[in-house]
Amino acid sequence: MTWTERVVEREGVRLVCRDWGGDGPTLVLLHGLAGHAGEWDALAGPLSSAYRVVAVDQRGQGASDRFPSDVSRDAFVEDVVAVADQLGLERVVLVGQSMGGHAAILTAARHPELVRALVVIEADVGGPDPEWPTHIRRWFDSWPAPFASRDAAVQFFGGGAIGMGWADGLEERGGQWWPRFDQDVMVQSVADAARHSFAHEWERVTCPTLLMLAQSSFISPARVDELMRRRVPTMSVSVRETRHDLHLEQPDIVYGLIAHFLADVSA
């Protein structure tokens, strides 16, 4: 299947979505920081054979408006609600990776009537961390952007499926390849998240939840155990030989885990 572009507007901010169509329960896919909806293409196609699938370019990223004035976590949550409302989506399954997973957790906690199930990929509720924005800015500063070619970008981002997934998020201008986001906006978004504690939000989530982790996860086993103790029902699974972007690295495995989880939810 192919996707259709859908545009949602909330408080003057345009949010661009890839609507893959499909029948059955609705899945809303949320990418991570500095990402784009196209990251989900390898998953969205197969998933749309059994589900309605919508992938969102979150505010400030991808094809959505690049300079929103509000990049608080509240804004990202209300964007998800607006996408569901304006596209007529009810009782959705939220699938989010990294910062998209964080937005998914907060949405499920604050809008339980909207979310029937939650798939969190390489994400945690987090907490105050004053060093995090500096770390992210240094990471962006390390990018040799603009890239001389798409191939150069693929190699910089590690090659293979992960490198291609990140390179697909760039845009070609004047023979060079540029990020489709503003670095300061992304750092500001992280800074907002780093100022607050969201631990209580995890315990407010009431829907069935799958926590999907990479073998080389930034979330420690002890932290996973804590999350599992604090909230039931939650399932966790670690995917062997994967890193943070496992949805790019092993989309077939991620697809199988999501499908199996949702079959149990529907049973």
Question: Which residues are covered by each model-predicted region?
Answer:
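Alpha/beta-hydrolase fold catalytic core
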Residues: 1-27, 49-51, 89-90, 233, ...
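Active-site loop/oxyanion-hole signature of alpha/beta-hydrolase fold enzymes
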Residues: 11-13, 41-48, 54-95, 99, ...
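Active-site glycine-rich loops that stabilize anionic/oxyanionic intermediates
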Residues: 24, 32-35, 98
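Alpha/beta-hydrolase active-site loop signature
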Residues: 34, 58-62, 125, 243-246
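Flexible "cap/lid" loop of the alpha/beta hydrolase fold
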Residues: 105-109, 116-146
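Conserved alpha/beta-hydrolase catalytic His-Asp/Glu region
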Residues: 130-133, 146-196, 201
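Conserved serine/cysteine hydrolase catalytic core
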Residues: 176-230, 235
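Catalytic histidine-centered segment of alpha/beta-hydrolase-like enzymes
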Residues: 242-251, 255
